[in-house]
Design a protein with these regions (language model features):
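Active-site neighborhoods and metal-handling regions in enzymes and metal-associated proteins
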Residues: 17-269
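Single conserved hydrophobic/aromatic residue that forms the stacking wall/gate
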Residues: 1-20, 269-270
Length: 271
């Protein structure tokens, strides 16, 4: 057997050695930038994400289509004495069956008073046999998220007071959707929704004062405690400022926003 001599480590050429010796140690390289002006890229990237192109709009539409089907399945599947997580599982299975890659955010399946807890995601309670179920869930398609919230009666039929409240929320949402145009800002849409919800609270007898005071004293906030909408895109609450030059920015073609007012009433009020 012939043994080969062990390979020796090649010696660097004198030129390479000189270059190596002249290299600045890593921990000293930043010193030459001490006078540089550094600015974050996030404002620029946020602006790029704010206006969606045609492909992005199509991805969002597909995500919404998948989400709508999942919500429909959940409504049909839900029965009394089920647990919230059972409804959640059936809905999310539908998302994935239809091509969703992941969830846009943790699904909310909230029955009874759980629906009054913003961002409730425990989903462990048994559904009240005569109550309502709120589902706030969205599938993600090609990295773009949807966001859909719906409320329905577990027994398949709204009571008269429940129907009245539902119609008032729908009225506010329709007003908001119809106001999504280049004449308005996100703030304008929220003010319209607040005005509509406040009038509804007065009409339903949920506040003991008139509309103007309900708004000025923010009495509506007990029943509608969040914004009306937010940008939608790669994130469910997508990047991009609602202001431009310290003023509310007008909506532009390519922007995508949700419109989701609500009236949240605890069971002790007997609605």
């Amino acid at each position: 057997m012939i043994r080969r001599p062990p390979r020796s480590t090649p010696k660097p050429s004198s030129a390479a050695s000189d270059v190596y010796k002249r290299q600045t140690p890593y921990d000293q390289r930043g010193s030459s930038f001490s006078d540089a002006s550094l600015r974050p890229l996030s404002p620029i990237l946020s602006e790029l994400r704010l206006i969606k192109n045609e492909d992005e709009i199509n991805y969002l539409k597909k995500a919404c289509e998948i989400t709508v089907e999942g919500h429909k399945v959940a409504m049909q599947y839900a029965q009394k004495n089920m647990f919230e997580y059972q409804i959640e599982a059936e809905m999310e299975k539908t998302f994935y069956d239809l091509g969703a890659e992941r969830l846009g955010y943790p699904s909310i399946v909230a029955s009874g008073d759980n629906a009054c807890i913003l961002h409730y995601s425990t989903n462990r309670e048994k559904v009240d046999n005569s109550g309502l179920v709120l589902i706030d869930a969205g599938a993600e398609y090609n990295m773009y998220s949807s966001d859909v919230t719906r409320t329905f009666p577990i027994n398949g039929k709204f009571s008269a007071p429940q129907k009245d409240v539902y119609q008032e929320v729908l009225k506010a949402q329709t007003l908001g959707i119809n106001s999504v145009n280049t004449k308005n800002t996100m703030s304008d849409i929220h003010k319209l929704a607040v005005s509509s919800i406040s009038q509804s609270l007065v009409d339903l007898g949920l506040v003991p004062m008139g509309v103007d005071e309900t708004i000025s004293m923010m009495h509506y906030f007990e029943f509608f405690m969040h914004g009306t909408g937010h940008w939608l895109g790669l994130d469910v609450h997508d990047a991009g400022s609602v202001e431009e030059n310290n003023k509310p920015r007008k909506l532009m073609p390519g922007m995508v926003t949700t419109v989701e007012p609500g009236i949240y009433i605890l069971s002790l009020i007997h609605i």
